[in-house]
UniProtKB/Swiss-Prot annotation:
Organism annotation: Listeria monocytogenes serovar 1/2a (strain ATCC BAA-679 / EGD-e)
Gene Ontology annotations for the cellular component aspect, listed alphabetically: ribonucleoprotein complex; ribosome
Protein's name according to its UniProt entry: Small ribosomal subunit protein bS21
Signal peptide: none
Gene giving rise to this polypeptide: rpsU
NCBIfam families: S21p
Length: 57
């Protein structure tokens, strides 16, 4: 869970920007999107092998 405290004399936009940066660095959004729907193990393996193939070329 990402937590951002608004500092003294800090605008809301700056605090929001810091919060978005911490969320993206922690990978929270990506993880939640990945777990949104159930994915069969066979589909996971297929995606993993396709990603490895893309990295190879």
């Amino acid at each position: 869970m990402s937590k951002t405290v608004v500092r003294k004399n800090e605008s809301l936009e700056d605090a929001l920007r810091r919060f978005k940066r911490t969320v993206s660095k922690s990978g929270t959004l990506q993880e939640s999107r990945k777990r949104e729907f159930y994915e069969k193990p066979s589909v996971k393996r297929k995606k993993k092998s396709e990603a490895a193939r893309k990295r190879k070329f």
